[in-house]
């Protein structure tokens, strides 16, 4: 099958696609970084909440655990 002469347009399209892929990868990397930072902040908040609960209830928890273990 004879190929149609595109006058070099195919090559330009390929470069454009490669450029678009590079931009897409940069955007994806940025999105991933933002998501990671948000998840890190969420995890830190949860751990802080757990620490607060343990500070308030740790002594009671230990007493009930020891009492149950000693029965």
Swiss-Prot record:
Region (Disordered): 1-36
Disulfide bonds: none
Biased composition (Basic and acidic residues): 1-18
Domain of life: Bacteria
Residue segments, region ARC ATPase binding: 27-65
Keyword tRNA-binding belongs to the record: no
Known pathway: Protein degradation; proteasomal Pup-dependent pathway
Cross-link Isoglutamyl lysine isopeptide (Glu-Lys) (interchain with K-? in acceptor proteins): where in chain: 71
InterPro entries recorded: Ubiquitin-like_Pup
Gene Ontology biological process terms, A to Z: modification-dependent protein catabolic process; proteasomal protein catabolic process; protein pupylation
Keywords on record: Coiled coil, Isopeptide bond, Ubl conjugation pathway
Record-level Gene Ontology MF annotations: proteasome binding; protein tag activity
Coiled coil is among the record's keywords: yes
Annotated coiled-coil segments of the chain: 30-59
Family according to the record: Belongs to the prokaryotic ubiquitin-like protein family.
Role played: Protein modifier that is covalently attached to lysine residues of substrate proteins, thereby targeting them for proteasomal degradation. The tagging system is termed pupylation.
Oligomer status and interactors: Strongly interacts with the proteasome-associated ATPase ARC through a hydrophobic interface; the interacting region of Pup lies in its C-terminal half. There is one Pup binding site per ARC hexamer ring.
UniProt note: domains: The N-terminal unstructured half of Pup provides a signal required to initiate unfolding and degradation by the proteasome but is not needed for pupylation, while the C-terminal helical half of Pup interacts with ARC to target proteins to the proteasome.
Protein name: Prokaryotic ubiquitin-like protein Pup
């Amino acid at each position: 099958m004879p190929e149609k002469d595109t006058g070099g347009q195919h090559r330009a399209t390929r470069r454009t696609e490669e450029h678009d892929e590079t931009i897409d990868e940069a955007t994806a990397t940025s999105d991933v970084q933002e998501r990671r930072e948000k998840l890190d902040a969420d995890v830190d908040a949860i751990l802080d909440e757990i620490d607060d609960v343990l500070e308030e209830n740790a002594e009671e928890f230990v007493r009930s655990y020891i009492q149950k273990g000693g029965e």
